[in-house]
Amino acid sequence: MPIDQIRDIVVRHGRLAASAADLTPTSDLYAAGLSSLTTVHLMLALEDAFDVEFPDRMLGRKTFESLQSIAEAIQELKAAA
């Protein structure tokens, strides 16, 4: 899963205090400023970009806590499609 593409979407839609350069694959996005409201915007942008739909079971904080966790979730959804 392209972490750089996910990073770009997170930076555009997450309204984080951290810059894109500061985000590693395992950086805590909530500690970087991601809120519940911006998580919804981020989720919708990710669904559009990757042509997936996050099921209810993936709508928790754990799915969106890092670039890596987002990539793993998208990879799982793509594999199941």
What positions do the PLM features span?
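Thiotemplate assembly-line natural product biosynthesis machinery
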Residues: 1-20, 73-81
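Helix N-cap/coil-helix junction residues
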Residues: 15-16, 34, 52
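Phosphopantetheinylated carrier protein domains
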Residues: 39-63
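Short, flexible turn/loop "capping" segments at secondary-structure junctions
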Residues: 21-23, 51
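Glycine-rich loop motifs involved in handling phospho/adenylate chemistry
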Residues: 24-35, 55-66
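Short alpha-helical elements of helix-turn-helix
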Residues: 4, 37-40
